[in-house]
Amino acid sequence: MYRIAVLPGDGIGPEVIEEGLKVLKAVEEKYGLRFDIKKYPFGGEAIDKYGEPYPEETRNGCLSSDAVLLGAVGGPKWDGLEGDKRPEAGLLALRKSLGVYANLRPAVLYPSLKDASPLKNELLEKGLDILVVRELTGGIYFGPRGKEAIGYGFRAYDTEVYETQEIERIAVIAFEAALRRRKKITSVDKANVLESSRLWRKTVEEVAKRYPEVELNHMYVDNCAMQLVKNPFQFDVILTNNMFGDILSDEAAQIVGSIGILPSASLRGDRVGLYEPIHGSAPDIAGKKIANPLATILSVAMMLQYSFGEEEAAQDIRKAVERALEEGFRTADLGKGIVLSTEEMGDKVVEYIKG
């Protein structure tokens, strides 16, 4: 039995989570799996109920589960709160308590959605499938920082710091992911300038020796940003640090044309993971039944693959999503086609899973 903590969260979170759970029920029945699913308050919902975004009840539930499935957090209702009391602070606390350090963000462009991409159609005939593996807990976002007054103003600094062990563990996750894909890794750094990047490159090369079947190449981050829009098909897995990954994963997401179909996973060394769509809580459309549930449904597929090792069930979900899109079914954010509500899109995916 697989234990799943579900955090519906705020805005459209509860709506898209319901469709994700509907898909879980379908694969549970089809593949004879068993899921122990428990919902917990989180984000703004938890603030309204408990006065904090990540209450002890939720924390204990997440820490005793095999995986966490999150909807979305935040909204203007809570914007006036202090930083550590806002819904988004709960997300940082959740990641820290779970000990996740690797963020995996697939950017998949289905041929049927190529008109939604800002790239030229002739670049997109083959579709697109990139996985960005970003280190989450080190680098310039977490290094020493400060601000001090000087004679004519201020001086501020942030420090990029990485240790061998931090680089090694994220590299292992990237190489393991590459084994399930096209067996190609592009490690992105700035080794021509930064000492931390030189350590990054050296460490990744050492890890690569354990994976002779995976092709490794290196690329400077500025060139990678250019190549993503010039020739995105050259990439399979992109491995990079915290700040570079923050930027490149958003760039890759925009190539796809809609964040409504993009899932993500945050992992640590074992099978425990946090799964969530990359879109926000979209309070402006909450309750209107037009939110796109596909990113959450595809996050469920990632959970089945990475936390539970249920590769066949995960692929079944992805194929059902692809079929729905190929047959012209859309939610409002995806443009022209047979426009479905949030619930109807979930039902369509379930229909194709059941066959």
Swiss-Prot record:
Belongs to the isocitrate and isopropylmalate dehydrogenases family. LeuB type 1 subfamily. InterPro entries: IsoCit/isopropylmalate_DH_CS, IsoPropMal-DH-like_dom, Isopropylmalate_DH. This is 3-isopropylmalate dehydrogenase. Its cofactor is Mg(2+); Mn(2+). PROSITE patterns: IDH_IMDH. It comes from the Bacteria. Substrate binds at residues 95, 105, 134, 222. GO terms for cellular component: cytosol. The keyword Nuclease does not apply. GO terms for molecular function: 3-isopropylmalate dehydrogenase activity; magnesium ion binding; NAD binding. Its EC number is 1.1.1.85. Catalyzes the oxidation of 3-carboxy-2-hydroxy-4-methylpentanoate (3-isopropylmalate) to 3-carboxy-4-methyl-2-oxopentanoate. The product decarboxylates to 4-methyl-2 oxopentanoate. It comes from Caldanaerobacter subterraneus subsp. tengcongensis (strain DSM 15242 / JCM 11007 / NBRC 100824 / MB4). Keywords: Amino-acid biosynthesis, Branched-chain amino acid biosynthesis, Cytoplasm, Leucine biosynthesis, Magnesium, Manganese, Metal-binding, NAD, Oxidoreductase. GO terms for biological process: L-leucine biosynthetic process. Gene3D superfamilies: Isopropylmalate Dehydrogenase. Mg(2+) binds at residues 222, 246, 250. It is an enzyme of class 1 (oxidoreductase). Pfam families: Iso_dh (PF00180). Homodimer. It catalyses: (2R,3S)-3-isopropylmalate + NAD(+) = 4-methyl-2-oxopentanoate + CO2 + NADH. Binds 1 Mg(2+) or Mn(2+) ion per subunit. It is found in: Cytoplasm. The record marks 141, 190 as: Important for catalysis.
